[in-house]
């Protein structure tokens, strides 16, 4: 399983920017000090149509 977090940062005018990261600390580093509205955990899986 590929466990990640999704971090959301408000960009203004009801728009959010989101990133996938392996840990909340990595998400904070990727946003370079910008305020993070929320962090959610998720599991990414490969999709196979067969």
Regions found by a protein language model. Give the residues of each.
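Short aromatic-glycine-(Arg/Gly/Cys) micro-motifs in beta-strand/loop hairpins
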Residues: 1-14
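Short, mixed-charge low-complexity intrinsically disordered segments
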Residues: 32-50
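A subset of signal/propeptide-processing and intrinsically disordered low-complexity segments
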Residues: 11-13, 30, 35
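Residues marking helix boundaries in flexible regions
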Residues: 7, 20, 37-40
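A short, exposed loop/beta-hairpin motif centered on an aromatic-Gly-Thr core
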Residues: 13-22
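Short, surface-exposed linear segments at secondary-structure transitions and domain or protein termini
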Residues: 24-30
């Amino acid at each position: 399983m590929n466990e990640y977090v999704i971090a959301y940062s408000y960009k203004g005018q009801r728009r959010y920017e989101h990133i996938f990261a392996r840990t909340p600390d990595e998400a904070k580093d990727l946003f370079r000090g910008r305020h993070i509205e929320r962090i959610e955990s998720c599991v990414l899986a490969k999709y196979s149509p067969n």
